[in-house]
Amino acid sequence: MMELEQVRVRFVRQDGKELAADETDWGLTAIDGAAAPQYQVYTSDQARGDGSFVTGRRVAARDLEFSAAVMDAGGNAVLRKAALSFFRPGVEYRIYLTYLGTTRWITGELTAFKAPSGPVGEAQTFSAYFLCAKPFWQSVDDFGQDIAAITPCWGWPYMDHPIFGVRAAVANFAREVVFDYDGDVPSYFKATITCDGPVTNPRLTGGDGYVRILTGMQQGDVLTIDFEAARVQMNGENILAKVDRASSFSAMKMGPGENRVSFSADVGENGMHVVLYYNKQYLGV
């Protein structure tokens, strides 16, 4: 029950340094902007008659504010010095917020920091302000899943059926994965493709489109595709120019509900291994 009631935040700076307000050294006193982003709706007046019509809509960048206080005023000097040094302008932070047992993260730029110089005997406080250009909270898990995974089935106690034998593993011969996406807003995934032998022109299909790479692969090659950034790399080298012109990165977006993604190739698809990674996106915490 205490876990569900606890509210905490962990700031991870771009260089890996961390500061937490988890009721150990610092405790959170206020949060603003975490529950929902700002929505913008654009309208234009009707040429005739009353009212307007909607011309556009978007989710704006998110402003976040966190305020915290020292748990034990005896640590004022050390903790204040650490906070003043930790929060720096022009640096990106990953912010992990836990509220009512749910933890999600978001990335933001520090826009302001305040640490009032109050009475030295009272608990020191600070407020940190962030601008999150990508306004949606992300799931902590990236849900990596191999489409062509072999599912092991041996277990204890071991049983060997006299007619059907023993089921040692199950292969996904359909080369398709079906998953239920329960995020609040659509998201894109990243794919890593490897192979056991020669593969020609690998292709991923999902939603209303596909992405096909006009290239050959050999064992040991690693092909990575980022569908949000429209980035394709083979062994770390940019090969975006080898994407089939009929391909559509935007069509590979995952929406709330059931999603299906499959893979194929002109040659060698039986030896392909495709792992999908994605973070679920949420409006708030």
Predicted feature residues:
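Polar/acidic, low-complexity leader/linker segments enriched in S/T/G and N/D
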Residues: M1-T43
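Residues at beta-strand starts and edge strands
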Residues: E5, A60-L64, V91, R104, ...
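Surface-exposed loop/edge segments in extracytoplasmic proteins
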Residues: K17-A21, T102-I106, G209-L214, I239-A241
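Oligomerization/assembly interface segments of phage tail-like spikes and tubes
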Residues: G49-G74, E122-F136, N259
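Beta-strand elements of well-folded, non-transmembrane domains
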Residues: A68-D72, Y99-G101, K114, C132-F136, ...
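Short, acidic/charged, Gly/Pro-enriched secondary-structure junctions
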Residues: A69-F113, R260
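Short beta-strand and beta-hairpin "edge-sheet" elements
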Residues: Y96-S139
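Intrinsically disordered, low-complexity segments enriched in serine, threonine, and glycine
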Residues: G144-V285
